[in-house]
Design a protein with these regions (language model features):
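Acidic beta-to-alpha connecting loop that harbors the catalytic carboxylate
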Residues: 87-90, 121-123
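Conserved alpha/beta-hydrolase "acid-adjacent" motif
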Residues: 90-100, 109, 126-127
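Conserved hydrophobic residues forming the short capping helix/wall of the S-adenosyl-L-methionine
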Residues: 105
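Catalytic active-site module of serine/aspartate enzymes centered on a nucleophile-bearing elbow/loop
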Residues: 126, 130-181
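General small-molecule cofactor/ligand-binding pocket signal
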Residues: 115-117
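Accessory cap/linker subdomain of secreted extracellular hydrolases
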Residues: 1-74
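Surface-exposed acidic, glycine-flexible loop patches that form ligand/cofactor-binding
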Residues: 70-76, 178-181
Length: 181
């Protein structure tokens, strides 16, 4: 929908996510309606991406540093945690968040196994290649190129990342079937 000409607006004063019907703590956005959408719109136009919200998240974290309550307690997860991201993700700074979770695992005792990879190029769509082709049987590569400037500039690197992700996910699932259950 639209609200005052904006395609998206922040939920103010409430969490986007819940667990066992209880709202989870969250980092509030520093931009209110309609500035929230205008920041996204301006960055999207400036970069040539289908959508670009990274500035929104970066500015929000600068205005409200994430507290311990708002951090996902990754160390409490049982099983394997597979984190995949790309430096050129323009929706949010995935690489920074993966590094933060990796550091958290070093600082807290845990029983889970962490497997992570950060690609230089892969865009926000760091999907396994086979999954992308299932979702978009025709033109999946073209769609990613249309969506993100980085995919236009680095198409082969993005494709190689998706192929590698495909193998990593398959390996993680195969190992989970053998061991973690």
């Amino acid at each position: 929908g639209k609200r005052d000409g904006c395609k998206e607006w922040p939920m103010e004063g409430e969490s986007l996510f819940s667990y066992k019907e209880e709202p989870l703590p969250y980092m509030p956005f520093c931009y209110k309606h309609p500035d929230y959408w205008h920041v996204i719109e301006k960055e999207t136009k400036r970069t040539g991406d289908m959508i670009n919200s990274r500035k929104l998240f970066d500015d929000s974290e600068k205005a409200h540093p994430i507290t311990e309550d708002e951090i996902i307690k990754i160390e409490k997860i049982h099983g394997t945690v597979l984190l995949i991201g790309a430096e050129d993700d323009v929706l949010w700074d995935t690489a920074k968040y993966i590094r933060r979770m990796k550091q958290r695992m070093k600082e807290h005792s845990h029983t889970c196994r962490l497997d992570y990879v950060i690609y230089e190029h892969g865009t926000h769509f760091v999907f396994p290649e086979s999954m992308l082709k299932t979702m978009l049987p025709v033109g999946s590569g073209l769609f990613v190129k249309l969506a993100f400037q980085a995919a236009r500039k680095y198409p082969e690197e993005c494709r190689r990342a998706r192929l590698d992700i495909d193998q990593r996910v398959r390996n993680a699932v195969a190992k989970w079937k053998r061991v973690d259950r």
